[in-house]
């Protein structure tokens, strides 16, 4: 790797909604610049995780360095920093954007601008990036690049006169994209002489070398063997290996301001090298860290329990290993009378939760029971103490608390206009507060609502997709906590409260949710030898109940005729046995029953 002058470096990323062709475009750029040979090429080269390919989404960030000889004959280094497109990973996106000077805005020419594209574009504009619009998939029969350009101009306010119409799949427009990156994206500022400051934009755990940190040098120079300090955690390490990603790792001796690379420094856990942290030298320290570092805070919590309690240590090890590569995942041990030992885990959002569960099941062969997702409530007790609760079963009784506050989010939904009525109805039933409605074009509308996060985390996304035949897209951001009429609803099975089924609900909806839940449990819990009452209760007041009838063994089968008192004796003996069983018998609750809370139709 030869030294490159800063003026020949271009750092850029690709912003796109899921399925608009970002990973395919990245593949084409790697091929066009000769970074990856055709025979090594596989679809979605930068999406390393099997799960990413399967779901067609980018979860962890990747980076690739490409050498490109432009038409002016000069050799340039282009660093592509990949970004996840999904709303749960918006913090990761904001850090990748901080490491760039430019962005390609990829929009599907047949679909138009979507909600998550908008959210990421606003982040890019905040970071003062040069944005190049690229209407993609122009060879599709339904493509209308002119309409998409108009949409970008109207909605985002970007000038689309220099937009490049492309099709990543057929390779149309790839050369023009590379040229425009060279000419439009500004080079990094040359601050090689200043104390080292480098931004960590991703890290992953390698079982042999420890944590591999991906970073962008903002100021100064970093060399192999340097002793570095991470400014947020205050820990120091020695660099064992320094290199660039091309896209496979290639070792180098030093990297200067503006360059992107990776280091291995025997770091034990990803939590020690947090994304967004600043790397500086241990001796010649920078005085100020780079701005914008935020510790990722989990928004959604749920309990994870192994179906076989002997595998609890395996689950603990798996979570420890996952946390090495996913700093946003939090967990703490939890016990439950119904499910034994497990963990209470915190996630960035619903997609993050699903992905972690799938990775645990897939990569570590675990069978898991998950409880209903809940959000973090703020409870003010009568003596003025503020508690943050992520578990409904820990809620203090009503006589000890002054108020409960729940997190609210601002939800932006972009939808074809003929589904507006159905979506407004959905938002209304989810306690949404209507804020605004804008027409992007004649046939597409943005709806803006404020609603409780608890109503969004269950199945709001699925409901939104099914009511709009899959056409709507959404984006949400936290706006703060608000007081609400919230109560804790317990579910009693055979008069015993079952912790994992407890939920915090709004008082107005408690009856509907309780009724739906006990009806669902009645379908899912198998019949036993004794009658099982199912009840939904708020405090000591039962608000909905159902019962599962007993299985009856025919004890009179052996009596052929004969005395009635003989039959009575047998029936009374059976009744006594049932009574004793009911008192001491345990109810076997299947995994599906716990999942029922997730899949409940919450329309009340």
UniProtKB/Swiss-Prot annotation:
Q: Which SUPFAM superfamilies match?
A: EF-G C-terminal domain-like, P-loop containing nucleoside triphosphate hydrolases
Instruction: Write the record's keywords in alphabetical order, separated by commas.
Output: Cell inner membrane, Cell membrane, GTP-binding, Hydrolase, Membrane, Nucleotide-binding, Protein biosynthesis
The reaction(s) annotated as catalysed by this protein in its Swiss-Prot or TrEMBL entry are: GTP + H2O = GDP + phosphate + H(+)
What superkingdom heads the lineage?
Bacteria
Q: Where does GTP bind?
A: 19-24, 136-139
Concerning SMART domains, the annotation shows: EFG_C (SM00838)
> Where is it found, in Gene Ontology cellular component terms?
plasma membrane
Q: How does it sit in the membrane?
A: Peripheral membrane protein
Where does it reside? Cell inner membrane
Q: What is its main location?
A: membrane
* All copies of domain tr-type G, residue ranges: 7-189
Question: For this chain's UniProt record, which GO biological process terms are given?
Answer: positive regulation of translation; translation
Q: Which PANTHER family match?
A: TRANSLATION FACTOR GUF1 HOMOLOG, CHLOROPLASTIC, TRANSLATION FACTOR GUF1-RELATED
Function text: Required for accurate and efficient protein synthesis under certain stress conditions. May act as a fidelity factor of the translation reaction, by catalyzing a one-codon backward translocation of tRNAs on improperly translocated ribosomes. Back-translocation proceeds from a post-translocation (POST) complex to a pre-translocation (PRE) complex, thus giving elongation factor G a second chance to translocate the tRNAs correctly. Binds to ribosomes in a GTP-dependent manner.
Similarity comment:
Belongs to the TRAFAC class translation factor GTPase superfamily. Classic translation factor GTPase family. LepA subfamily.
Protein name per its UniProtKB record: Elongation factor 4
Q: What is the lineage of its organism?
A: Bacteria, Bacillati, Cyanobacteriota, Cyanophyceae, Synechococcales
Gene that this polypeptide is encoded by: lepA
């Amino acid at each position: 790797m030869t030294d490159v002058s800063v003026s020949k470096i271009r750092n850029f990323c690709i912003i796109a909604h899921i399925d608009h062709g970002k990973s395919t475009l990245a593949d084409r750029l790697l091929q066009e610049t000769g970074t990856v040979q055709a025979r090594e090429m596989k679809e979605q080269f930068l999406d390393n995780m099997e799960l990413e390919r399967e779901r067609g989404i980018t979860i962890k960030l990747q980076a690739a360095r490409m050498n490109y000889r432009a038409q002016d004959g000069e050799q340039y280094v282009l660093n592509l920093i990949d970004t996840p497109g999904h709303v749960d990973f918006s913090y990761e996106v904001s850090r990748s954007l901080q490491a760039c000077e430019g962005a390609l805005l990829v929009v599907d020419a047949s679909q138009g601008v979507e909600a998550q594209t908008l959210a990421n574009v606003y982040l890019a504009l905040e970071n003062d990036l040069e944005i190049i619009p690229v209407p993609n998939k122009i060879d599709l029969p339904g493509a209308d690049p002119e309409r998409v350009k108009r949409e970008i101009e109207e909605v985002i306010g970007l000038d689309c006169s220099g937009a490049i119409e492309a099709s990543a799949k057929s390779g149309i427009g790839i050369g023009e994209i590379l040229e425009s990156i060279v000419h439009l994206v500004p080079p990094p500022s040359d601050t090689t002489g200043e104390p080292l400051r480098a931004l960590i934009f991703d890290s992953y755990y390698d079982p042999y070398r420890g944590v591999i940190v991906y970073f962008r040098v903002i100021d100064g120079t970093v060399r192999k063997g340097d002793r570095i300090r991470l400014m947020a955690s205050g820990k120091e390490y020695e660099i064992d290996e320094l290199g660039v990603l091309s896209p496979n790792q290639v070792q180098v001796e030093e990297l200067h301001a503006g360059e992107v690379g990776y280091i291995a420094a025997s770091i034990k856990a990803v939590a020690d090298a947090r994304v967004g942290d600043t790397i500086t030298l241990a001796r010649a320290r920078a005085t100020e860290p780079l701005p914008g570092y935020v510790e990722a805070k989990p928004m959604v919590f749920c309990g994870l329990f192994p179906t076989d309690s002997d595998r609890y240590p395996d689950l603990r090890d798996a979570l420890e290993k996952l946390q090495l590569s996913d700093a946003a995942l939090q967990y703490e041990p939890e016990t439950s009378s119904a499910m034994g030992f497990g963990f209470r885990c915190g996630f960035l959002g619903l997609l993050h939760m699903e992905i972690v569960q799938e990775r645990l099941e897939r990569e570590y062969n675990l069978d898991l029971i998950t409880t209903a997702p809940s959000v973090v409530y703020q409870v003010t007790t009568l003596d003025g103490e503020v508690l943050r609760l992520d578990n409904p079963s820990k809620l203090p009784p009503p006589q000890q608390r002054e108020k409960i506050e729940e997190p609210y989010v601002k939800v932006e939904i972009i939808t074809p206009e003929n589904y507006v009525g159905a979506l407004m109805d959905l938002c209304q039933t989810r306690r949404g507060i209507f804020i605004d409605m804008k027409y992007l074009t004649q046939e597409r509308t943005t709806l803006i609502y404020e609603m409780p996060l608890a109503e969004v985390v269950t199945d709001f996304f699925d409901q939104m997709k099914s009511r709009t035949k899959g056409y709507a897209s959404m984006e949400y951001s936290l706006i703060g906590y608000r007081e609400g009429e919230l109560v804790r609803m317990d579910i009693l099975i055979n008069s015993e409260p079952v912790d994992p089924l407890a939920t915090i609900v709004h008082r107005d909806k408690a009856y509907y949710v309780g009724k739906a839940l006990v009806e669902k449990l009645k379908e899912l819990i198998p019949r036993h030898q004794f009658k099982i009452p199912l009840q939904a209760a708020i405090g000591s007041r039962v608000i909905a109940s159902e019962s599962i009838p007993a299985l009856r063994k025919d004890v009179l089968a052996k009596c052929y005729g004969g005395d009635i008192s003989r039959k009575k004796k047998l029936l009374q003996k059976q009744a006594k046995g049932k009574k004793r069983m009911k008192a001491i018998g345990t109810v076997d609750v299947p995994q599906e029953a716990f999942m029922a809370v997730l899949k409940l139709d919450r329309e009340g």
